[in-house]
Amino acid sequence: MVTDLGGGYAEAEGGPVRHIPVLLEPVIEALEPSAGKVILDGTFGAGGYTSAILDTGADVIALDRDPNAIAGGQAMVAARAGRLTLHHTRFSTLDNFAPEGGLDGIVLDIGVSSMQIDEAERGFSFQRNGPLDMRMSGTGVSAADVVNRAKVGDLIRIFGFLGEEKQSGRIARAIEKRRVNHPFQTTRDLAGMIEIVTPRKAKDKIHPATRVFQALRVFVNDELGELAEALFAAERALKPGGRLVVVTFHSLEDRIVKKFFSDRSGKAAGSRHMPMAFERPATFEPVGKGMVTATEEEAEINPRARSAKLRAGIRTAHPAMKADFSIFDLPDLAEIERLGA
């Protein structure tokens, strides 16, 4: 059985499956990189997209919040003779790295990277025992902090919304009971307890801990907030005609990207904050016919591609709009995040 972990990476029960860039051909087709263009890769990871973009003759500005990714990318920086610059930062800050006149393209591959999964000490995998960490940057609140300190109601919200876990209440209450005398310290420790509380059924395609681990990772790294901020930053950073390409791996991420492009299309749909739909100048036009998914051939070769979705837009000449996070209808998790203060 293969568990999709996002970010173009999957995990089999017998061990890890190596990284292969997901939807690589559609990404390059949507970006249209070429000599003389400057493309920003906001999620460098193992450098799969960056390498392919450089091969077209375009120059690349690459970002990653993981210091290990930055260290691992130095050989590529040296080999590409001044055509690649690599920065240790969150991709939500990408507009700080745009050259005068703007970027020709931006690609974001949302999710955990292969290197992060490979390293047991990072705590992303329940198949590889290690500290319950999950911090991409190595700083801030860890998954263990959340599991051992958050209120049970907050755990229910985290697991239910960010992991779409139907058994969030049962799991959260079991965590609360167990951590009083035995705080959770390792990935296998938490995964084992979840498997006892919600045992796997014959029809289940994923491990019982998959959604909880996803929720913790997304929460610890503020992945949805980072994505939302990055989309607004991309709107500011792209030149007219520049292209934004985003690859997501679960419905929460895809929903944010879809809502952003819809809102910026000039025909914004109504929301609970502004029920009436309205028209305004568009800042993005669609690329192609809409969402792109993996072909049957790619999904057969690379099982992790099955859940990948690509959405892309072309920047118009209209000025960037105000960053209005209400368009995403995200829950307010700020109170929970204070446990890191």
Curated annotation (Swiss-Prot):
HAMAP family attached to this UniProt entry: 16SrRNA_methyltr_H
Sorted UniProt keywords: Cytoplasm, Methyltransferase, rRNA processing, S-adenosyl-L-methionine, Transferase
SUPFAM superfamilies: Putative methyltransferase TM0872, insert domain, S-adenosyl-L-methionine-dependent methyltransferases
Subcellular location: Cytoplasm
Enzyme class name: transferase
The enzyme's E.C. designation: 2.1.1.199
Keyword Translocase: no
Highest taxon in the source lineage: Bacteria
InterPro entries to which the protein is assigned, alphabetical: RsmH, SAM-dep_MeTrfase_MraW_recog, SAM-dependent_MTases_sf
Keyword Iron (UniProt): no
Alphabetized Gene3D superfamilies for the sequence: Putative methyltransferase TM0872, insert domain, Vaccinia Virus protein VP39
GO BP field: rRNA base methylation
Record family assignment: Belongs to the methyltransferase superfamily. RsmH family.
Binding site for S-adenosyl-L-methionine: G47, G48, Y49, D64, F97, D109, Q116
Protein name, UniProt field: Ribosomal RNA small subunit methyltransferase H
Gene field: rsmH
Disulfide bonds: none
Stored Pfam families: Methyltransf_5
GO cellular component: cytoplasm
Reaction it catalyzes: cytidine(1402) in 16S rRNA + S-adenosyl-L-methionine = N(4)-methylcytidine(1402) in 16S rRNA + S-adenosyl-L-homocysteine + H(+)
Protein's job: Specifically methylates the N4 position of cytidine in position 1402 (C1402) of 16S rRNA.
